[in-house]
Amino acid sequence: DHYYYDDFENERTITDIAERSYMPALNALLDMIKANDQYFKVAFSLSGVGIEQLEMHAPQVLDKLQELNETGCVEFLAETYAHSLASIGDPEEFKAQVRMHTEKVKALFGVEPKVFRNTELIYSDDISELVYELGFEGMLTEGAKHVLGWKSPNYVYASAIRPQLKLLLKNDRFSEDLSIRFDDHSWKEYPLTADKYISAISATAEGEKIINAFMNYEVLGSMHAADTGIFDFFKALPQYAERNDITFSLPSEIFAQTRPVDSISVPYPMSWVDEEKDCSSWLGNVLQQEAFRKLNEISERVRLCENRRIKQDWIYLQSSDHLYYMSTKHYNLFSPYDNPYDAFNNYMNVLSDFILRVEAQFPSSIENEELNSLLTTIQNQGDEITRLKKELEAARK
């Protein structure tokens, strides 16, 4: 019946993580906002696929996010709907997914994202061009040393090829103190207290006014369990920040108030993963490269399909997690497979079946010229809608 999903496992995973991490973390963040007279602010990025799973298995998480949204101290960022690698594999698919995600966020929370956060903070000059064309004012990415050199990540930068697109760069030290080292008993700074953390931020060089702490949401309650003190640590941050004249800002607020100090050039995609800060965790071996190639080969035909099930399966097949599970670089804590080869075999079996379904609708015998003509029409319609929306917004201002 071409049904590829383990609904029982999906439900178990989502309900478990919602109970251990999402709900207690959201309650803590809401308390931080209310207890500190809206001094604390936070931005969220949720993929469309993630939102769909929450709608099915943990709708209380979305209700709590809406409650946070109503405080005015929260910003929702745009990203790819499928948490995919479309930005480096298929520009048209990337644009379609971002538009789809923006509509989903707007429908749920009543706000249209102004700032973009790509899957795993992946960024390059070419990607910045696509993000600019989609109408975003800024983007979040990694403050990779091999890109920055002597420069500090603690400023606003701009895209080298689209200077109108502003960039916020992740501060590795202050992000990973929380996401990786917080519960490391061998770390010289252990135990990390809110006082110590804020004092270290205060000690950064004068003029470096923006510290971007980006982390996986599961840091709160899952990667660091409640008994590590992670929730108490977070709850204490606003009061120590205020004592040290450190404020919290949303990405769009920073972009509105701050001019870029310089541009950065990133000819090859970088990410926030591993020491290399590249894309090798998803595309570093032949298994991953073959799966990604095979996936992208059929994208044009899928975009012409009207079948709802094919469209849905296409989105879920593009999740970057599938490729991450095939990585041979390191042990994968979150993989449901015993090894990368099982992950590859299962994915390719599903993808092969999916390709047969697509071929039944648009056989490979159809000439590429005919396909391209249809796709160009669809693409032009999408671009025209984006242009008209921009004109409408400008007229409202």
Language-model regions: role of each:
Residues 1-90, 114-117, 137-142, 250:
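Short, well-structured secondary-structure segments
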Residues 1-21, 34, 155-157, 161-165, ...:
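Active-site and substrate-binding clefts of carbohydrate-active enzymes
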Residues 26-30, 62-66, 95-105, 128, ...:
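Generic structural signal for well-ordered alpha-helices
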Residues 48-52, 81-84, 121-124, 145-146, ...:
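Short, solvent-exposed loop/turn segments at secondary-structure junctions
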Residues 61-78, 99, 111, 132-153, ...:
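Acidic, His- and aromatic-enriched active-site or binding-groove loops in soluble protein domains
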Residues 84-107, 165-205, 224-227, 278, ...:
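Alpha-helical scaffold elements lining the catalytic groove of polysaccharide deacetylases
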Residues 87-89, 147-155, 177-179, 260:
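Short, charged, surface-exposed secondary-structure boundary motifs
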Residues 92, 96-121, 126-130:
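A conserved hydrophobic secondary-structure block that centers on an alpha-helix together
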